[in-house]
């Protein structure tokens, strides 16, 4: 991937930084999750997986969450990729950010010491005619149940506990997130990680 290691002409400093990180198999979710962000992350995951399906991808997350459909597109692409995807919470991993953090490869999910993780019920607004609202509400109920099931699978908690704990905003410190099962390790230095594994 030598062409990716040379900054492209016309890129600003921020673009060059993210391009350099990409060349090191590091991708970054540092904003609200929307369709544009999801398309970019999915493309990056697919590119890196095609380039070397045996090497880990590192996904750093500092996000307030966002669109359910966009987040699920990222999740499905993570599952599709043959390589392990290590996830790192830094700053805040809230809502869909928490979901993607916990969806990382088991044993390779990390939180920085002062990261905060937020779990709550998926949020969705419904508009339109009464019939449209009923259809949207039914679809929202389906995806909410699926996210509860997946979060239970990620964390090892029961679906019932996930539902109860998601009823209102619930914040976790890094240590609490570790105990709950969102992450596997709390790290303070990159040197403690070798080949995606905490030492």
Swiss-Prot record:
Its EC number is 3.4.21.92. GO terms for biological process: protein quality control for misfolded or incompletely synthesized proteins. It catalyses: Hydrolysis of proteins to small peptides in the presence of ATP and magnesium. alpha-casein is the usual test substrate. In the absence of ATP, only oligopeptides shorter than five residues are hydrolyzed (such as succinyl-Leu-Tyr-|-NHMec, and Leu-Tyr-Leu-|-Tyr-Trp, in which cleavage of the -Tyr-|-Leu- and -Tyr-|-Trp bonds also occurs). Keywords: Cytoplasm, Hydrolase, Protease, Serine protease. The active site is at 95 (nucleophile), 120. The keyword Hydrolase applies. GO terms for molecular function: ATP-dependent peptidase activity; ATPase binding; serine-type endopeptidase activity. One of its GO terms (cellular component) is cytoplasm. It is an enzyme of class 3 (hydrolase). It is found in: Cytoplasm. The keyword Heme does not apply. It comes from the Bacteria. InterPro entries: ClpP, ClpP/crotonase-like_dom_sf, ClpP/TepA, ClpP_His_AS. Cleaves peptides in various proteins in a process that requires ATP hydrolysis. Has a chymotrypsin-like activity. Plays a major role in the degradation of misfolded proteins. Belongs to the peptidase S14 family. HAMAP family: ClpP. This is ATP-dependent Clp protease proteolytic subunit 2. The gene is clpP2.
